[in-house]
A protein has these predicted regions:
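Long, basic N-terminal domains or extensions that often function
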Residues: 1-247
Length: 247
């Protein structure tokens, strides 16, 4: 199992758009992973006006293996009077890439039918994640979106970079000419340069070094602390505390 980190770096997103975007990222990833049988642990979403971040722990290396049961034509339609396979049986087998002899006769509530029963080995997650994450970018919706340059797809603001790591491997996403990498960017004013991300732990360490507080809850707490400290330091004001409206 490996951790997944996915960050969409953008120009300034309106503050009111962020929380709904976080929820969409979480819900879309969870549903897509379920549909693809990719097991995973906790899903965390966070960000700033210049980044939308998804972090998923303990993502399975591959899809879950399954036993596939595909129902074919009825036994009556599958054999002729001489007991040979009919075109219906042969066509069903051909469509599934097997020989008619690989089909089994099974009892169903509607009678006897041919069925293909086979083990399906799951594909590697690293090969599936580009589509999953690429679709999330395309499907995120906002009250207002825009197109820029010669791009055919819209987004809330121009995308500047894409960080996508599965463990230490870069997830091969490309969106409107922007290729995912292991690079992110620091605070726009205080540390406006790129840095390498090697893991989820590295991501948070580097963000702290580059003056970015990516967790919205922590950011609110810091703002409240700074405001209260300023109030207490001002002898012209009566002491008190500040409440932040979380709505």
């Amino acid at each position: 199992m490996r951790d997944l980190i996915f960050e969409i770096g953008t120009e300034e997103i309106p503050a009111g758009y962020l929380e709904p975007a976080y929820a969409q990222m979480r819900d879309k990833f969870t549903q897509k992973a379920k549909d693809l049988r990719i097991a995973h642990g906790a899903v965390k979403v966070m960000g700033t006006p210049r980044r939308l971040t998804l972090i998923v722990s303990d993502v399975a290396e591959s899809q879950e293996d399954i036993k596939e049961e595909l129902l074919g034509p009825s036994k009556k339609a599958a054999y002729d009077a001489n007991g040979n396979f009919t075109k219906a049986a042969e066509g069903f087998a051909r469509s599934k890439g097997v020989a008619p002899s690989d089909l089994k006769v099974v009892n169903t509530p509607k009678g006897e039918y041919l069925m293909l029963i086979r083990e399906v080995v799951g594909q590697g997650s690293l090969g599936l994640l580009p589509d999953v994450l690429g679709e999330i970018i395309k499907e995120l919706s906002f009250p207002k979106s825009m197109r820029w340059g010669a791009n055919s797809l819209s987004f809330v603001r121009p995308i500047q970079w894409i960080l996508a790591l599965f463990g230490s491997d870069i997830v091969a996403i490309e969106h409107e000419g922007i290729k995912a990498s292991n690079l992110s960017s620091g605070h726009r004013f205080h540390a406006n340069n790129t840095f390498v991300v090697e893991s989820v732990a590295s991501y948070f360490e580097q963000l702290e070094k580059h003056k970015v507080v990516v967790d919205p809850k922590v950011r609110r707490e810091l703002v409240v602390q700074e405001i209260n400290a300023a109030l207490q330091a001002n002898t012209d004001l009566v002491g008190g505390t500040v409440a932040v409206d979380e709505a």
